[in-house]
Amino acid sequence: CSDEDLLVQIKAVISASRFYGEGYRKVWARLRLKGIRTAPRRVRRLMKEHGLQAPHQVRPAGDDQHDGTIVTERVDEMWGTDMTQTVTTEEGRAHVFVAVDHCSGELVGIHAAHGANRFEALEPIHQAVARHFGGIRGGIARDLTLRHDHGSNYMSDDFQDEIKFLGIASSPAFVRQPEGNGVAERAIRTLKENLLWVRHFATVEELRQGLLAFAETYNATWLRERHGYKTPNQIRAEQVGLEPAFTIEHKMAA
């Protein structure tokens, strides 16, 4: 098709995407999913000429995030967990917790709470274990490793004792080393850019529901370049069988 026709399709893909700042490679992949075949460099050229390129982020020297370096070949071998903060309009500060699969990038657990103690930090882990291992009982997740930082909630006896009970091996990240918590940190950055920085929530419960909806969309539509532009749900389905739909009624929302 002509450049003009392809540009129309590129703009349509960008408008339809629920994610901010996707680069030309993902736009090209989404065009392919629509049956539109073209070269990635052509998509890049048109996006550049018409001001459609994703913002380019240059990290400051000394930034030791290592996104994507601690990846696994199979799902449910290693998860990463981390937290961030946001502000609700009626209830003030809220804490957001995530758990992310290091193979597929799937948001396996997500939670919001007023506080940031070790019990709140455990919530996305409980969600994910119940969903992907079939329940909460001793040793059920014995083949899983959990990457986390050195925050007091994650290093507390209660947190460490609980994941040990579940059979999960603790893997604290080390500062200024490639074995960082970059996978979870990258997921939180995407969450901020596409939800926390662009929407307002009145209450923590409203935020929690918004996070669940975001996770459903993310797992179903976010494209993973390393896996040939497949979604987290597709990656899991290929490895372990068809995954049930992520719904608010699911255990994750409990």
Where are the regions a protein language model picked out?
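RNase H-like polynucleotidyl transferase catalytic core
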Residues: 57-61, 142, 146-150, 164-183, ...
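C-terminal domain-tail junction helix/linker
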Residues: 157, 164-168, 190-254
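An active-site-proximal beta-strand-loop segment
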Residues: 80-108, 114-116
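Active-site beta-loop-alpha junctions of metal-dependent nucleic acid enzymes
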Residues: 88, 92, 110-137
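Mobile genetic element proteins and their domesticated derivatives, centered on retroelements
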Residues: 10, 27, 43, 82, ...
